[in-house]
């Protein structure tokens, strides 16, 4: 009588090789990314593991297709609707695994921050939430029509080595929006720079920075990377306080030095240290080659006028 066949899979991670059996066996790669013990009910931890294995085997599929039968599909929806299941429980195991991979890696690690928008079509969007208000064209009288999008916003920080190897998430924040009417008029009446950062949605950049450093514990190895939306003076101050680093695409040409010139004015006087060519797409979608000039200098940046007293 022959031995039963088992489908094996190999996975290499930082020089170690691990063998996992198929999802129905005793081990799976997902076991290294979750912590079933954080759930208040052991059955929730077991269901969470089974659900991840099924959805991992059908990435891009709907929940019914990934679950394959009605019993598993119903169990999946019950898990998501369970008030005892929190995002912190779901993510805690992955955060621990990210920290372990960070400690096993060497050298500088990039923490890429950005916001992702998930859009859904629902008969009752109020049960999910709203992400934004968009222009949907004009009516017969030429008036602009607007409608809100149903969905969820996720702001995350992804740890990546300088060789491009992803280590995992270090911070995640989920939210929806509730108010759009009158916000544009409100911006015309107040100076946004005078509003405390704690009262702005953009505080998520600072929250993720704190959470990431708190998880990894080695700020000197981290470089936080963000787009123009992260050009926030409070973020620069927090980065300095936490003894870490950042790379941000500048949106505002801030005052620098003694206040009689800007950052760009000061950098224009710096010699070019090198050139870097990248390929991007123009407004027509055609690929073009762009040459970037590399200049480096330590610059003293002044706070916005509305925040100089704080």
Summary of predicted features, one role per range:
Residues 2-310:
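Conserved, well-structured functional cores that handle cations and Mg-NTP chemistry
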């Amino acid at each position: 009588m022959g031995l039963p066949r088992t489908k094996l899979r190999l996975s290499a991670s930082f020089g170690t090789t691990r063998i996992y059996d198929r999802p129905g066996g005793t081990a799976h790669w997902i076991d290294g990314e979750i912590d079933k013990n954080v759930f208040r009910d052991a059955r929730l931890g077991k269901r969470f593991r089974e659900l991840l294995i099924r959805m991992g085997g059908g990435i891009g599929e709907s929940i019914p297709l990934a679950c394959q039968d009605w019993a598993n599909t119903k169990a999946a929806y019950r898990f998501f609707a369970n008030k005892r299941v929190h995002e912190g429980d779901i993510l805690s195991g992955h955060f621990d695994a990210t920290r372990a991979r960070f400690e096993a890696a060497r050298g500088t690690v990039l923490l890429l921050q950005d916001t992702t928008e998930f859009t859904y079509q629902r008969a009752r969007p109020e049960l999910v939430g709203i992400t934004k208000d968009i222009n949907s064209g004009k009516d017969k009288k030429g008036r602009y029509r607007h409608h809100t999008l149903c969905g969820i916003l996720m702001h995350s920080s992804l740890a990546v080595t300088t060789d491009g190897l992803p280590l995992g998430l270090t911070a995640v924040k989920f939210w929806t929006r509730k108010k759009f009417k009158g916000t544009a008029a409100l911006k015309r009446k107040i100076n946004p720079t005078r509003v405390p950062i704690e009262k702005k949605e953009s505080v998520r950049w600072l929250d993720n920075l704190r959470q990431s450093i708190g998880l990894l514990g080695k700020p000197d190895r981290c470089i936080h990377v963000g787009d123009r939306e992260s050009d926030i003076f409070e973020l620069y101050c927090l980065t300095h306080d936490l003894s870490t680093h950042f790379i941000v695409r500048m949106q505002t040409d801030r005052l620098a030095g003694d206040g009689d010139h800007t950052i760009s004015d000061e950098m224009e006087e710096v010699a070019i240290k090198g050139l870097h060519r990248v390929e991007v797409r123009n407004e027509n979608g055609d690929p073009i080659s762009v040459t970037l000039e590399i200049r480096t200098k330590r610059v003293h940046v002044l706070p916005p006028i509305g925040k100089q007293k704080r």
